[in-house]
Amino acid sequence: MTNGIRASQLFQNLPVYWSFREVLSLEQPIHTWIPLITEALRQFFAKCEPSQRIRSELPPHLSVTGDVYIGRNVSLPPFGTIEGPAYIDDECILRPSVYVRGNVIVGRGCVLGNSCEFKNSLLLEHVQVPHFNYVGDSILGNGAHLGAGCILSNLRLDQQCVCMQMPTGEKIQTGLRKLGAILGDGAQAGCNSVLQPGACLFPNAVVYPCESFKGTRLAKSAKALSQTDKNSLQ
């Protein structure tokens, strides 16, 4: 199996009801999930009857095209764009001008904010992406949070394949030209921060507001937050 950071190192568990376990597992290196999102959605829609795909009322000016699943009690905006294939689970909140560009999986109770763009990405449960964010070719763990204006960059300036850094410092070749950021459960990135291609935050790790971060950050290795730092994150 390809070397890399295992999904089990970042996520405590996957939802028991999850429809994508046959394709995505905790034993896989996490970067291998990115190209598998398309296949996971293909298999889901092959089994899901069209009449069972939209379970919340669609506002008249919300554009929904392609294979799209929307669960129960989803709060949908008066305008925005959802392009399939896309899966949005129960009790999510989508805000005005949201743009789902396809190949997106969103778990229960997530917030997809105003003027936020999502492309080829996976959000587990209760993820908050509330204001002016870009999430491309990325994976966000349970309870992860992006501050306003945080960008998950997914393409190097030289357009070469993206590397990921192991906790030991060793670099792993992913073979992916486009790879955004991976956030473990409870990880946070502050307002106007930029996570460079291949950035990885372990569970509960923090990227500070306006920080440009690359590499891998372990929660236990981050400096202790001073009171000033805590105030800046509130």
Residue ranges and their predicted role:
Residues 56-225, 229:
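Structural signal for interior beta-strand "rungs" in well-ordered beta-sheet cores
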